[in-house]
Structure formats: C-alpha cells, structure tokens
Amino acid sequence: MNLASVLLLLAACHLSVSVNGQEHKEAIELSMANHDHVLGSAQVVFVAFCADWCPFSRRLKPIFEESARVFHQENPQASAVWAIVDSQRQADIGDKYFVNKYPTMKVFVNGELITKEYRSTRSVEALTNFVKFQLSTAINEFSSQDQLNQEMDKSKRNVVAWLKKDGPEFANLKKVASILREDCSFWVPTDHFGTQTNDNKLSFFDPDSNEEAKFTGNFNDYDFVKQWVTDKCIPLVREVTFENVEELTEEGMPFLIYFRDPDNKTTDKVFGEAVARELYDQRSAINPLLADGHKFAHPLKHLGKTKEDLPVLAIDSFQHMYLFPDMTQMNIPGKLREFVMDLHSGKLHKDFHENLDQRMIELAKAKAARGITDDHEAQAPSTRPIDTTPPPSVFKELKPSDKRYSILQKSEL
C-alpha cells in the first residue's frame, strides 16, 4: 500500500470517528423512526419540542444546541442525550406527549417521562445545570438512625429504604427516586450501617399525619413499587403556589381550591379527607388544591372575599369562578361531591344566571362591606351588560405566558 493510500485511509477513519462522536456531542433530531432507540440510549434524555414558525423556538434552538456541545465538552462520560423535535415534521411525537405550546422542554430518565417540564431560564448555564442535576443521585445516605432523624425534613414527604445496593431491588428504587425526586426525599443507609439488617424494608413517612406506611409488596416488581411510591409522594390534594401554578393549569382540569390562612392549616386534613371520601373517582376530572389565602388574595377579591373570610372554597373552571355557598356544610356527606358534579353538569352556571341579579346585589354588598373595589363598582346590578357571568377565572391568567411560548389550542385552558 503506497503512502497516499495510507493517508487516505487514516483520513477516512478520522472522519468516521468524528461523525460517530458527534452523535453524542451535539443535539440530535428526534423522530418517530429513532424515538425508542434515543430514549433508551442514555440515563437522561433532554428533549426540546420546537416549531420553525414559533419565534421563541427559533431563539431557543441555537442556545439548546450550544448547551449540548458545552455540556458534553465538560462532561464527556455523562450518560445524557440532547434532542430536538421538529414539531411540524414530527407532529406525532408532540401528540404523543400532549405538547400544546412551543417551545416545550421535557426530560426522560431511564426512558421514562418526568412529569415536570423544564420551565426555567433559557440559557446555556441554566440548561446544562439542569441536566447535571437530573444525572446527580436522587438518594440521600445516612450512617445512623440519629443522623436520619436530624437531617430528614419531617415537613416533607420522605421514603426510607433498607435494600442491598447490589441487588435489583435497589436498582428499582434508584429509578423510582430519579422520577419522583421533586416530590419526595429518598433515604438509604450507608453500606456499613445497612448491614445491620438482612430484610428488605421500604417505608413512607407522611408529613401531615406523622404516620409510617410500610411497603408489603414484591420489591422486584418495578411497576408495583413505582405505583406505590407515586401514590404516596404525589398526594390527592396538592398545594398551589406561584411557582407551580403554570404546570397545574396545563393539566387541564378545573381547580377545586381551598383557600386558608397559612398560619392555621388545621383544616387542611379535614379538606383532604373530604376529597378522598367524596371525590376519589373524580381525580381525572377535578384538581383539588390548597392555597395560601394571603398570597392568593386576588382570586378571593373576585369572589367578594378577603382573608377575614378564610377558609373559602371555590371552583375555577378556567372560564369562571364559583363559590361554595356555605363552608359549614363542607363536611356534610354529599355536599362537596354535589358541588363538583354541578360544575360538570352545567348546573352551577345555569343557577348563577337564573339568580343573576340577586347574586350581583349580594356580591356588591359583600365587596362594599369589606372595602373591596373593582372596575365595575359604579355600575348597579341592573345596569350590567346582559352577558354578565360568574366572576371570571383568575387562574387562567396564570397559564403559560404568550411572552415565552406560542400557545396551541388556547380555548382548552
């Protein structure tokens, strides 16, 4: 073989290595053809759903691509893939994951979709730090029972497991912890401390009841373990905050909101028990939430209420807000369910219009008595426009901003 042939062969080999290396160092295009392979190819797969017609997508794409390059330069051995979906050409993928705005960034861990999207700063530093966090361990270690008692925040949801770290049971727990790391804190003993027991144990510690729930199923059944931990870590009734309200609105279900005094949460449990008792089968139709009545004073104002009236229960349908008429009846069997079912049947809206004048008079009196003013204060109920409706939704205004996203199907929110 002459020198020219050798040089040509070396150049071809170098090109091949470079191309293969680029698969992992740059953002790749995710399609239905490579979907399963890509999602299963790394511990973390970070996906940006973009559309060329969307100005926010056009701004994000070069930042996302640069983030992928920077991340892999700094972390060449990391098990992570950055991928971009051209949502015009690959609409099926967007439909598969219910993408209704662009850009949307989702993360998959061990091939499974994490519920919470990435919604933070769109910068190289922020994006790379996010992927590093997803790759970091989601499990805390303790070397003694005293250390666990001192470091475990009992105001949060905690899962404590005693499992051999070289077994499939621990591998299952690691996968579950990676998915639910933002919903629960996970704890395992150090290798030395863990040898004090030979039995597999998994417990959940409820911050509300201070009770311990023990897992009694098959530790090798990943789906069963995941479902058990998920049911414990994601409660039936959640707290709505300004930080999570955007993602809650995207779940698309009307809010059943229990506004209460943040310094007096004694009735939280009462509300939770009422929801579990009467609305458990409505989990896919209503979103029961707790809200700080001081921070969310604006929705209360729309209902003619102030912090002096707390607790207050209302439904926000993303079109209108409906007030639970008598808080003393919340624990009467059937009343809470009736309130929710009346929303679904349209009865709440119908009843409001049938008694419109009287309700507007009552609302005006309530606002006047509490010194609440709004844009309509000078109008007598009889002079209101004929299409006057229940108080408009406030939480709809907290949905994803059209200053950051191109929103699809706006009428559904």
From Swiss-Prot:
GO terms for biological process: protein folding. It is found in: Endoplasmic reticulum lumen. It comes from the Eukaryota. Pfam families: Thioredoxin, Thioredoxin_6. Keywords: Disulfide bond, Endoplasmic reticulum, Glycoprotein, Signal. A motif (Prevents secretion from ER) lies at residues 410-413. InterPro entries: ERP44, ERp44_PDI_b, Thioredoxin-like_sf, Thioredoxin_domain. One of its GO terms (molecular function) is protein disulfide isomerase activity. Disulfide bonds join 184-233. Residues 22-136 form the Thioredoxin domain. Residues 367-413 are annotated as: Disordered. The thioredoxin domain lacks the 2 redox-active Cys. This strongly suggests that it lacks thioredoxin activity. This is Endoplasmic reticulum resident protein 44.2.
